[in-house]
From Swiss-Prot:
Its EC number is 5.6.1.7. Signal peptide: none annotated. It comes from Rhizobium etli (strain ATCC 51251 / DSM 11541 / JCM 21823 / NBRC 15573 / CFN 42). It is found in: Cytoplasm. GO terms for molecular function: ATP binding; ATP-dependent protein folding chaperone; isomerase activity; unfolded protein binding. Forms a cylinder of 14 subunits composed of two heptameric rings stacked back-to-back. Interacts with the co-chaperonin GroES. This is Chaperonin GroEL 3. Pfam families: Cpn60_TCP1. Transmembrane segments: none annotated. GO terms for cellular component: cytoplasm. ATP binds at T30, L31, G32, P33, K51, D87, G88, T89, T90, T91, G415, D496. Together with its co-chaperonin GroES, plays an essential role in assisting protein folding. The GroEL-GroES system forms a nano-cage that allows encapsulation of the non-native substrate proteins and provides a physical environment optimized to promote and accelerate protein folding.
Length: 544
């Protein structure tokens, strides 16, 4: 075990704070409509240009191990907010840095960190309740477009495209974003389906950055039973390898030797393969496999139908243009199934819904019907260069996540106004002692941080903007950094999803409170570089 370096108390928190500030300074410049871009060097290919906070945060790794701990903790805030709400990562980072900065000062002044933490928790939960109470449900397609446009940094065409996509496949429908082969960005609705099962092993992942499996033009094998051994599968696996196409295996389960063999083949590059469990249970599983078979023009391999695995041919496998598999979901896009077969399946389900008397069965049939009939909306992102396409794709994915969050929990005034106005929930709030009250005040001050940063990125003094807005009684009044005017944010279409604002504050408060209560830091002592090797004696002058 290597020797460790230990830092205590104020020294430990000072190192943490330096790391937090370095990460915050890199991320905060992207906030708001006039936020700047960040250029990230890549090991191969052109540098990446992005305005996405979580992408910037994920790239940061500091040389000093103690400072790096602080940076990684706040990076966790950005990642967690992104996972839960899909947007608001920069806001979460700015809030976390503000709460920790103020908290570290008060701990250094002799206040009790545990009491401060209690105050922060009280303040955050009061603000969350206030945000939820003020949230307004999203009703129209126009409001959905507004949310999308704001999340895409003021790009109205992106907002409109997302609103159209939601109109076509429904608010709960499947919408995917992929790179186009042309310069235009377009929306297309294709036959497809999503179900709640993810990859059986992370070794199947093909896109490590997004931790997902992306299969282009794959064969799809649908098997009703568990797979424990691959012996029976070998003939069809060899046939798929000959085609050079990937293979998706959907079965009740893939266990032990079979899973290990597939993983080894994938890692060695012999066979592009991924395996997922079939959705549903019992008879419902069989029905869903038949739905997928209709969608992909494949055949379900079932011994009830007299088909054995060893006799399967390529013609029995389904096909699709693209399959995306994440940790918990699988999306099949543009299956090659015939429209007539899919329609027949849909009609059969509608008839079953009419006939069934069980509410539970009816609900499950309606779920299956929605999955099969809804299709998948695909937004194909175009651009002049690969760098532009990647940057635009980041923004559209952010906007899509924000719109889903808005539909889920409603909207609040954007541009940092919702947090600033929610300060009223903490006015006069007192803790059980002075230190708890100081913790509440930390949150009170932090609520101004996002709007200050948006103003500063637009070239204004943040405190002047905050001062002017605080003096106005209208809760929707805010500063539009794009036009540099004071407007009614909701009327101007500058809105944020309540879920994004709430999640950003909760995650920031949680991590910052943990950092404030840190008293000791432990890290490996960096290894000293060994002295350079000395040349053999007596060989100094060899006549060169």
């Amino acid at each position: 075990m290597s020797a460790k370096e230990i830092k205590f108390s104020t020294d430990a928190r000072a190192h943490l704070l330096r790391g937090v500030e370095l990460l915050n300074n890199a991320v905060k410049v992207t906030l708001g409509p006039k936020g700047r871009n960040v250029v990230i060097d890549k090991a191969y290919g052109a540098p990446r240009i992005t305005k996405d906070g979580v992408t910037v945060a994920r790239e940061i790794e500091l040389g000093n191990k103690f400072e790096n701990m602080g940076a990684q903790m706040v990076r966790e805030v950005a990642s967690k907010t992104n996972d839960l709400a899909g947007d608001g990562t920069t806001t979460a980072t700015v809030l976390a840095a503000s709460i920790f900065r103020e908290g570290a000062k008060l701990v250094a002044a002799g206040m009790n960190p545990m009491d401060l933490r209690r105050g922060i928790d009280l303040g955050v939960s009061a603000i969350v309740k206030e945000i939820q109470a003020r949230a307004r449900k999203v009703k129209s397609s126009g409001e959905i477009a507004q949310v999308g446009a704001i999340a895409a940094n003021g790009d109205a065409t992106v907002g409109e495209m997302i609103a159209k996509a939601m109109e076509k496949v429904g608010n709960e429908g499947v919408i995917t974003v992929e790179e186009a082969r042309t310069a235009e960005t377009e929306l297309d609705v294709v036959e497809g389906m999503q179900f709640d099962r993810g990859y059986l092993s992370p070794y199947f992942v093909t896109n490590a950055e997004k931790m997902r499996v992306e299969l282009e033009d794959p064969y799809i094998l649908l098997h009703e039973k568990k797979l424990g051994s691959l012996q029976a599968l070998l003939p069809i696996l060899e046939a798929v390898v000959q085609t050079g196409k990937p293979l998706l295996l959907i079965s009740e389960d893939v266990e032990g030797e079979a899973l290990a063999t597939l993983v080894v083949n994938k890692l060695r590059g012999g066979l592009k393969v991924a395996a997922v469990k079939a959705p549903g249970f019992g008879d419902r599983r069989k029905a869903m496999l038949e739905d997928i078979a209709a969608l992909t023009s494949g055949q379900m391999i079932s011994e009830d139908l007299g088909i054995k695995l060893e006799n399967v041919t390529l013609y029995m496998l389904g096909r699709a243009k693209r399959v995306l598999i994440e940790k918990d979901t699988t999306t099949i896009i543009d299956g090659t199934g015939e429209k007539a077969a899919i329609q027949a399946r849909i009609q059969q389900m509608k008839a079953q819904i009419e006939e069934t008397t069980s509410d539970y069965d009816k609900e499950k049939l309606q779920e299956r019907l929605a999955k099969l009939a809804g299709g998948v909306a695909v937004i194909r992102v175009g651009g002049a260069t690969e760098t532009e396409v990647k940057e635009k794709k980041d923004r559209i994915e952010d906007a899509l996540n924000a719109t889903r969050a808005a539909v889920e929990e409603g909207i609040v005034p954007g541009g940092g106004v919702a947090l600033l106005r929610a300060k009223s929930a903490l006015t006069g709030m007192v803790g059980e002692n002075a230190d708890v009250t100081a913790g509440i005040s930390i949150v009170l001050r932090a609520l101004e941080a996002p709007i200050r940063q948006i103003a500063e990125n637009a070239g204004f003094e943040g405190s002047i903007i905050v001062g002017r807005l605080t003096g106005r009684n209208d809760h929707n009044q805010g500063f539009d950094a794009q036009t540099e005017t004071y407007v009614d944010m909701v009327e101007a279409g500058i809105v944020d999803p309540a879920k994004v604002v709430r999640t950003a504050l909760q995650d920031a408060g949680s991590i910052a409170a943990l950092l404030i209560t840190a008293e000791v830091m432990i890290a490996d002592i960096p290894a000293r570089n060994p002295a350079p090797a000395v040349g053999n004696g007596g060989m100094g002058d060899m006549g060169y």
